[in-house]
Design a protein with these regions (language model features):
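C-terminal membrane-cytosol helix-exit motif in multi-pass small-molecule transporters
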Residues: 24-45
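Juxtamembrane intracellular "pre-TM" segments in multi-pass secondary transporters
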Residues: 40-65
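Extracytoplasmic gate region of multi-pass secondary transporters
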Residues: 58-107, 167, 171-172, 220-221
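Cytoplasmic membrane-interface "Motif A"-like loop-to-helix N-cap segments
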Residues: 118-131
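C-terminal ends and interior cores of transmembrane alpha-helices
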Residues: 131-147
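Hydrophobic core of transmembrane alpha-helices in multi-pass small-molecule transporters
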Residues: 150-167
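Intracellular juxtamembrane helix-capping segments at the cytosolic ends
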Residues: 165-193
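A late C-terminal transmembrane helix in Major Facilitator Superfamily
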Residues: 188-224
Length: 224
Protein backbone atom coordinates (compact mmCIF):
# COMPACT_ATOMS: atom_id res chain seq x y z
CA UNK A 1 0.00 0.00 0.00
CA UNK A 2 1.13 3.54 -0.68
CA UNK A 3 1.67 6.07 2.06
CA UNK A 4 3.75 4.20 4.60
CA UNK A 5 3.39 1.40 7.12
CA UNK A 6 -0.02 0.19 8.36
CA UNK A 7 -1.51 0.81 11.79
CA UNK A 8 -2.94 -1.96 13.98
CA UNK A 9 -6.69 -1.84 14.60
CA UNK A 10 -8.72 -3.11 17.56
CA UNK A 11 -9.50 -6.42 15.86
CA UNK A 12 -5.82 -7.23 15.43
CA UNK A 13 -5.76 -6.45 11.73
CA UNK A 14 -3.99 -3.70 9.86
CA UNK A 15 -5.27 -0.36 8.66
CA UNK A 16 -3.65 1.97 6.12
CA UNK A 17 -5.45 5.05 7.43
CA UNK A 18 -3.12 7.45 5.65
CA UNK A 19 -4.37 6.18 2.31
CA UNK A 20 -7.80 7.69 2.99
CA UNK A 21 -6.52 10.95 1.55
CA UNK A 22 -6.31 9.37 -1.89
CA UNK A 23 -10.11 9.49 -2.07
CA UNK A 24 -9.73 13.13 -3.08
CA UNK A 25 -7.44 12.42 -6.04
CA UNK A 26 -10.21 11.78 -8.63
CA UNK A 27 -12.04 14.94 -7.56
CA UNK A 28 -8.84 17.00 -7.73
CA UNK A 29 -8.04 15.66 -11.19
CA UNK A 30 -11.58 16.35 -12.42
CA UNK A 31 -11.53 19.88 -10.99
CA UNK A 32 -8.12 20.56 -12.54
CA UNK A 33 -9.28 19.41 -15.97
CA UNK A 34 -12.45 21.49 -15.76
CA UNK A 35 -10.43 24.55 -14.75
CA UNK A 36 -7.88 24.01 -17.54
CA UNK A 37 -10.38 23.51 -20.33
CA UNK A 38 -13.42 25.40 -19.06
CA UNK A 39 -12.23 28.57 -17.32
CA UNK A 40 -11.45 31.81 -19.10
CA UNK A 41 -8.70 34.10 -17.82
CA UNK A 42 -9.57 37.77 -17.48
CA UNK A 43 -6.97 39.55 -19.59
CA UNK A 44 -6.97 42.87 -17.76
CA UNK A 45 -6.58 41.15 -14.38
CA UNK A 46 -3.14 39.79 -15.20
CA UNK A 47 -0.22 41.21 -13.26
CA UNK A 48 3.44 40.23 -13.06
CA UNK A 49 5.14 39.50 -9.76
CA UNK A 50 6.93 42.84 -10.00
CA UNK A 51 3.59 44.62 -10.35
CA UNK A 52 2.12 42.72 -7.42
CA UNK A 53 5.16 43.12 -5.18
CA UNK A 54 4.16 46.71 -4.51
CA UNK A 55 1.91 45.32 -1.77
CA UNK A 56 4.98 44.69 0.40
CA UNK A 57 5.30 48.47 0.66
CA UNK A 58 1.68 48.88 1.73
CA UNK A 59 1.16 49.29 5.45
CA UNK A 60 -2.37 47.97 5.24
CA UNK A 61 -1.17 44.74 3.66
CA UNK A 62 0.66 43.88 6.87
CA UNK A 63 -2.21 45.07 9.05
CA UNK A 64 -4.61 42.83 7.16
CA UNK A 65 -2.18 39.91 7.52
CA UNK A 66 -2.37 40.41 11.26
CA UNK A 67 -6.16 40.65 11.31
CA UNK A 68 -6.72 37.71 8.97
CA UNK A 69 -4.35 35.56 11.00
CA UNK A 70 -6.58 36.37 13.96
CA UNK A 71 -9.69 35.19 12.09
CA UNK A 72 -8.81 32.58 9.47
CA UNK A 73 -5.62 31.60 11.31
CA UNK A 74 -7.71 30.94 14.41
CA UNK A 75 -10.27 29.00 12.38
CA UNK A 76 -7.73 26.67 10.78
CA UNK A 77 -5.66 26.42 13.96
CA UNK A 78 -8.67 25.59 16.12
CA UNK A 79 -9.71 22.99 13.52
CA UNK A 80 -6.37 21.26 14.00
CA UNK A 81 -6.11 21.77 17.76
CA UNK A 82 -9.66 21.27 19.04
CA UNK A 83 -9.77 17.45 18.68
CA UNK A 84 -6.39 17.15 20.39
CA UNK A 85 -7.33 19.45 23.26
CA UNK A 86 -10.75 17.87 23.72
CA UNK A 87 -9.34 14.33 23.73
CA UNK A 88 -6.63 15.23 26.23
CA UNK A 89 -8.96 17.06 28.62
CA UNK A 90 -12.05 14.85 28.27
CA UNK A 91 -10.71 11.31 27.76
CA UNK A 92 -14.02 9.73 28.78
CA UNK A 93 -15.95 11.49 26.01
CA UNK A 94 -16.01 10.25 22.42
CA UNK A 95 -15.08 13.71 21.17
CA UNK A 96 -14.89 12.76 17.49
CA UNK A 97 -18.68 12.49 17.46
CA UNK A 98 -19.00 16.19 18.26
CA UNK A 99 -15.92 18.25 17.42
CA UNK A 100 -16.64 18.28 13.67
CA UNK A 101 -19.60 20.56 14.42
CA UNK A 102 -17.36 23.50 15.30
CA UNK A 103 -15.47 23.77 11.96
CA UNK A 104 -18.74 23.11 10.12
CA UNK A 105 -20.38 26.07 11.86
CA UNK A 106 -17.35 28.23 11.07
CA UNK A 107 -17.43 27.34 7.38
CA UNK A 108 -21.16 28.01 7.13
CA UNK A 109 -20.93 31.31 8.99
CA UNK A 110 -18.29 32.58 6.59
CA UNK A 111 -20.52 31.94 3.61
CA UNK A 112 -23.74 33.07 5.28
CA UNK A 113 -22.69 36.30 6.99
CA UNK A 114 -20.89 38.25 4.28
CA UNK A 115 -23.93 40.50 3.95
CA UNK A 116 -23.40 41.67 7.53
CA UNK A 117 -20.08 43.29 6.58
CA UNK A 118 -21.59 44.75 3.43
CA UNK A 119 -24.34 46.36 5.49
CA UNK A 120 -22.45 47.51 8.59
CA UNK A 121 -18.86 47.74 7.31
CA UNK A 122 -16.06 45.20 7.51
CA UNK A 123 -13.98 47.14 10.04
CA UNK A 124 -16.87 47.50 12.48
CA UNK A 125 -17.79 43.83 12.19
CA UNK A 126 -14.15 42.74 12.59
CA UNK A 127 -13.90 44.75 15.82
CA UNK A 128 -16.86 42.90 17.32
CA UNK A 129 -15.53 39.59 16.02
CA UNK A 130 -12.39 39.99 18.11
CA UNK A 131 -14.48 40.98 21.13
CA UNK A 132 -16.50 37.80 20.59
CA UNK A 133 -13.36 35.71 20.31
CA UNK A 134 -12.08 37.07 23.61
CA UNK A 135 -15.39 36.22 25.28
CA UNK A 136 -15.30 32.75 23.74
CA UNK A 137 -11.75 32.16 24.94
CA UNK A 138 -12.70 33.09 28.50
CA UNK A 139 -15.68 30.75 28.22
CA UNK A 140 -13.49 27.87 27.04
CA UNK A 141 -11.11 28.41 29.96
CA UNK A 142 -14.02 28.53 32.43
CA UNK A 143 -15.67 25.31 31.25
CA UNK A 144 -12.33 23.58 30.86
CA UNK A 145 -11.52 24.22 34.49
CA UNK A 146 -15.02 23.10 35.48
CA UNK A 147 -14.67 19.87 33.49
CA UNK A 148 -17.85 20.64 31.56
CA UNK A 149 -17.53 19.24 28.03
CA UNK A 150 -20.89 20.61 26.86
CA UNK A 151 -19.99 24.16 27.81
CA UNK A 152 -16.47 23.72 26.46
CA UNK A 153 -17.78 22.58 23.06
CA UNK A 154 -20.45 25.29 22.98
CA UNK A 155 -17.83 27.99 23.52
CA UNK A 156 -15.64 26.56 20.79
CA UNK A 157 -18.60 26.43 18.40
CA UNK A 158 -19.26 30.08 19.25
CA UNK A 159 -15.63 30.96 18.53
CA UNK A 160 -15.74 29.11 15.23
CA UNK A 161 -18.88 31.01 14.33
CA UNK A 162 -17.31 34.40 14.97
CA UNK A 163 -14.09 33.46 13.17
CA UNK A 164 -16.23 32.62 10.14
CA UNK A 165 -17.85 36.03 10.37
CA UNK A 166 -14.37 37.55 10.71
CA UNK A 167 -13.07 35.69 7.67
CA UNK A 168 -15.73 37.40 5.59
CA UNK A 169 -15.39 40.82 7.23
CA UNK A 170 -11.60 41.05 6.88
CA UNK A 171 -11.75 40.12 3.20
CA UNK A 172 -14.46 42.74 2.72
CA UNK A 173 -12.12 45.35 4.18
CA UNK A 174 -9.27 44.79 1.71
CA UNK A 175 -10.79 46.20 -1.51
CA UNK A 176 -12.44 49.01 0.43
CA UNK A 177 -9.09 50.03 1.92
CA UNK A 178 -7.20 49.82 -1.36
CA UNK A 179 -9.81 51.83 -3.26
CA UNK A 180 -9.11 54.57 -0.74
CA UNK A 181 -5.34 54.13 -0.44
CA UNK A 182 -4.31 53.83 -4.10
CA UNK A 183 -5.55 57.30 -5.16
CA UNK A 184 -3.74 58.77 -2.15
CA UNK A 185 -0.49 56.87 -2.75
CA UNK A 186 -0.52 57.13 -6.55
CA UNK A 187 -2.18 60.47 -7.37
CA UNK A 188 -0.75 60.39 -10.90
CA UNK A 189 -3.24 57.66 -11.88
CA UNK A 190 -6.53 58.67 -13.47
CA UNK A 191 -9.83 57.36 -12.13
CA UNK A 192 -10.07 54.18 -14.21
CA UNK A 193 -6.36 53.43 -13.83
CA UNK A 194 -6.54 53.94 -10.08
CA UNK A 195 -9.49 51.55 -9.90
CA UNK A 196 -7.62 48.86 -11.85
CA UNK A 197 -4.53 49.32 -9.68
CA UNK A 198 -6.63 49.03 -6.53
CA UNK A 199 -8.20 45.83 -7.84
CA UNK A 200 -4.80 44.32 -8.66
CA UNK A 201 -3.38 45.20 -5.27
CA UNK A 202 -6.51 43.94 -3.51
CA UNK A 203 -6.26 40.58 -5.26
CA UNK A 204 -2.57 40.26 -4.38
CA UNK A 205 -3.21 41.20 -0.75
CA UNK A 206 -6.04 38.66 -0.48
CA UNK A 207 -3.70 35.91 -1.67
CA UNK A 208 -0.78 36.99 0.51
CA UNK A 209 -2.84 37.38 3.70
CA UNK A 210 -4.36 33.93 3.12
CA UNK A 211 -0.91 32.38 2.87
CA UNK A 212 0.32 34.09 6.04
CA UNK A 213 -2.84 33.27 8.02
CA UNK A 214 -2.52 29.58 7.15
CA UNK A 215 0.37 29.41 9.62
CA UNK A 216 -2.32 29.40 12.30
CA UNK A 217 -2.64 25.66 11.61
CA UNK A 218 0.95 25.31 12.84
CA UNK A 219 1.38 27.57 15.83
CA UNK A 220 -2.06 27.23 17.49
CA UNK A 221 -1.82 23.42 17.96
CA UNK A 222 1.76 23.95 19.16
CA UNK A 223 0.37 26.15 21.93
CA UNK A 224 -1.59 23.18 23.28
Amino acid sequence: AMGGDPLPNKEGGQLWLQNAGFIWVPFIIASSLLAWFGMNDIADAKASFAEQSVIFQRKHNWLMCWLYTGTFGSFIGFSAGLPLLAKNQFPDVDVLKYVFLAPLVGAISRAATGWVSDKFGGARVTFWVFIGMMIGTLGVIHFLQAGNFTGFLAMFIFMFFVTGVGNASTFQMIPVIMRSEVPRLMPQLAGAEATRQAEKESAAIVGFTSAIAAYGAFFIPKAF
